[in-house]
UniProtKB/Swiss-Prot annotation:
NCBIfam families: MalateDH_bact, PRK06223.1. NAD(+) binds at G11, S12, G13, N14, I15, G16, D35, N97, V120, T121, N122. Catalyzes the reversible oxidation of malate to oxaloacetate. It catalyses: (S)-malate + NAD(+) = oxaloacetate + NADH + H(+). Substrate binds at R84, R90, N122, R153. It is an enzyme of class 1 (oxidoreductase). This is Malate dehydrogenase. Its EC number is 1.1.1.37. It comes from Ehrlichia ruminantium (strain Welgevonden). One of its GO terms (molecular function) is L-lactate dehydrogenase activity.
Length: 313
């Protein structure tokens, strides 16, 4: 009998709870849901477990506040941290969430040093670097969830504007997870037809694409302003689980994620959103695209912003 993979979710808030549910739906493995709020972790785990007879999914799930329970986890997704309130930027979260990540990273190093770690906590590009520095895990075993979500938002907005299925749209967003992300129009298409060609065909205007790019950059902020008391969690959870699935099942999907760069794109010792291939060995390849002068300028501005944010961690 094949042993189930052990997946630890650190943080049982909206995103953590949704990730746990999606993992069960997809039968990806057994789940440990950890939170300092013991009751929340145990309550959500029990609620999900009680849905198993209806959903016909197998595997164990339990909640805890004890880091020892993540021992020998195959993969870990970190969502713990305070979330944004209206008017608050991701950057406002830094001081509090770095301390949270530091504690988590120390315990991952102690109990699950061989795990593949996906960081979701914002501000993403700062938190994933903090995870790397404090856990001392290999750089190929730590990634941040950002580009998958940003690309999904961009694809959705394009699909709605063109009145086509979201399944027809492919897009790619690089750079930091914030206002200076870089949606790559040249690498975005609808059933193989580039956005540039769709503009030429009159199916969408350049101004509308520019508007969609800006809406994508403000995608998280838009949801925060609507919810008033929280931030997005359905799409972030789906994004993290897609990355997890690629690792656990060696799918080798090429996905835009925050990954550690060692000279690629001219960047050293930072986690930045770029296309990577995720397989059983973690980050198996960083795909280095040739950017235009304009794209490179935006990308470098994004990198500079990340450098400023991580200066004091």
């Amino acid at each position: 009998m094949i042993q189930s993979k052990k997946i630890a979710l650190i943080g049982s808030g909206n995103i953590g709870g949704m990730i746990a549910y999606l993992i069960r739906l997809k039968n990806l493995g057994d789940v440990v849901l950890l939170d300092i709020n013991d009751g929340m972790a145990k309550g959500k785990a029990l609620d999900i477990a009680e849905s198993s007879p209806i959903g016909k999914y197998n595997g164990e799930i339990f909640g805890t506040n004890n880091y020892a329970d993540i021992e020998n986890a195959d993969a870990i997704i970190v969502t713990a941290g305070i979330t944004r309130k209206p008017g608050m930027s991701r950057d406002d979260l830094i001081s509090t969430n770095v301390n949270i990540i530091k504690e988590i990273a120390t315990n991952i190093a102690k109990y699950a040093p061989n795990a593949f770690v996906i960081v979701v906590t914002n501000p993403l590009d700062v938190m994933v670097l903090a995870m790397y520095r404090y856990s001392h895990l290999p750089s190929n075993m730590i990634v941040g969830m950002a580009g998958v979500l940003d690309s999904a938002r961009f694809s959705y907005f394009i699909a709605k504007e063109l009145n086509v299925s979201v399944e027809s749209v492919d897009s790619l967003v690089l750079g930091g997870h914030g206002d200076i992300m870089l949606p790559l129009i040249r690498y975005s298409s609808v059933s193989g037809v580039s956005i540039a060609d769709l503009i030429k065909l009159g199916m969408i205007t350049h101004d509308k694409v520019t508007e969609i790019v800006e809406r994508t950059r403000k995608g998280g902020e838009e949801i925060v302003s609507l919810l008033k008391t929280g931030s997005a969690y359905y799409a972030p959870a789906e994004s993290a689980v897609l990355m997890l699935d690629s690792y656990l099942n060696d799918k080798k999907l090429m996905l835009p994620c925050s990954a550690y760069l060692k000279g690629e794109y001219g960047v050293h010792d930072l986690f930045v959103g770029v296309p990577i291939i995720i397989g059983k060995n973690g980050v198996e390849k960083i795909v280095e695209l040739q950017l235009t002068e304009e794209e490179n300028s935006i990308f470098n501005n994004s990198v500079a912003l990340i450098q400023n944010l991580v200066a004091n961690i």
